[in-house]
């Protein structure tokens, strides 16, 4: 069953993405091996090694961290000053054939505003020499919910969100195995963002390799299974955001704990090896700072049993992606 077969879903989700072609090289992996890129004397990307496979991966980092440069290296727009970049087993730089595999949605507004949306997507289909450019164009427009009268208006009349969607349609028209998106949600309203996130999820589930950057951290947290954190041109951390946070042992984790006897529990926790500090909240409960996530989790249960205290809630207070990002940048 595809999403088209689910009653009431097509209007929201659009046509189901085609499975990514397997190809001779298997899954379309992106491999960066000790990659560095200089702009003059400025190091934009510094000795990054990573492998990205099928699914959705988020690039996270402050402005100027090197995210766009990294995407341009993967898309073959820039050559590595050192190291190698391959996509689906092919060298990315100076290789026009790579564009059969890659779809790119750049951050800047790289559209021909005098064309209609349909003409712009169709022109991309023809550049790829697709056998049925008209059908491919219609399918791509439907995937981004632009298969309306708006498709036949000039792009210069579009809102920012509509321009973003038409760029995504052009990137998808040839059904690439790899999709690279730089700040793809800019200008989209909440419904459009929800639809685009659902589309990227479904593409990832169908075996495509999706890499996107976003300055809206909640979207990265909701959308991507894997996060690559880029800080000052370096790969600062890699994994899901909870794993990244737990690996950062140089700073304490903060927990909100509610129990049947907060004072007794607080007194028993003070001085324990895994606990760095305890505060009683005026509204009830404890705020506990712990240096070792796993050790504290085990010790808290043991202490509660010893004191005859019933635990009502134990919640990490600082595991949002915003918190992870703040810690990584600060360090």
Feature locations, PLM:
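ABC transporter nucleotide-binding domains
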Residues: 27-30, 37-218, 222-231, 237
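C-terminal coupling/interaction segments
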Residues: 2-15, 292-331
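Alpha-helix N-cap/helix-start and coil->helix boundary motif
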Residues: 36, 92, 118, 210, ...
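ABC transporter nucleotide-binding domain
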Residues: 196-289
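Primarily ABC-family ATPase nucleotide-binding module
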Residues: 17-28
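Residue-level "edge-of-site" marker
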Residues: 154, 283, 317
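Residue-level detector of short coil/turn "hinge" positions at structural boundaries
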Residues: 132, 148, 276-277, 311
């Amino acid at each position: 069953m595809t999403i088209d077969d689910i009653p009431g879903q097509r209007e929201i989700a659009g046509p189901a993405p085609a499975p990514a072609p397997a190809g001779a090289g298997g899954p379309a992996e992106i491999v960066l091996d000790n990659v560095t890129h200089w702009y003059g004397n400025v190091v934009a990307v510094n000795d990054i090694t990573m492998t990205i496979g099928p699914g959705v991966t988020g690039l996270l980092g402050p402005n100027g961290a090197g995210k766009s440069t990294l995407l341009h290296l993967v898309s073959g727009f820039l050559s590595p000053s050192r190291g190698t970049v391959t996509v689906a087993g092919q060298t990315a730089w100076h290789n026009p054939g790579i564009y059969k595999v890659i779809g790119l949605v750049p951050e800047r507004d790289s559209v021909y505003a005098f064309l209609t949306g349909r003409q712009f997507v169709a022109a991309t289909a023809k550049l790829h020499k697709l056998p049925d450019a008209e059908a491919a164009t219609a399918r791509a427009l439907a995937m981004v919910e632009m298969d309306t009268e708006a498709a036949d208006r000039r792009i210069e009349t579009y809102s920012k969100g509509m321009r973003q969607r038409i760029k995504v349609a052009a990137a998808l028209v040839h059904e690439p195995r790899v999709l690279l998106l730089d700040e793809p949600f800019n200008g989209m309203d909440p419904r459009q963002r929800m639809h685009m996130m659902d589309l990227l999820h479904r593409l990832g589930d169908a075996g495509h390799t999706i890499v996107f950057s976003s300055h809206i951290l909640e979207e990265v947290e909701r959308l991507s299974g894997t996060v690559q954190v880029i800080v000052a041109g370096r790969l600062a951390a890699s994994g899901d955001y909870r794993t990244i946070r737990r690996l950062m042992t140089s700073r304490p984790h903060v927990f909100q704990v509610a129990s049947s006897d907060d004072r007794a529990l607080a007194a028993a926790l003070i001085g324990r090896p895994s606990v760095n500090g305890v505060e009683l909240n005026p509204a009830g409960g404890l705020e506990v700072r712990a240096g070792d996530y796993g050790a504290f989790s085990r010790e808290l249960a043991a202490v509660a049993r010893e004191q005859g205290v019933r635990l009502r809630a134990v919640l990490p207070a600082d595991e949002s992606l915003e918190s992870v990002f703040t810690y990584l940048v600060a360090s």
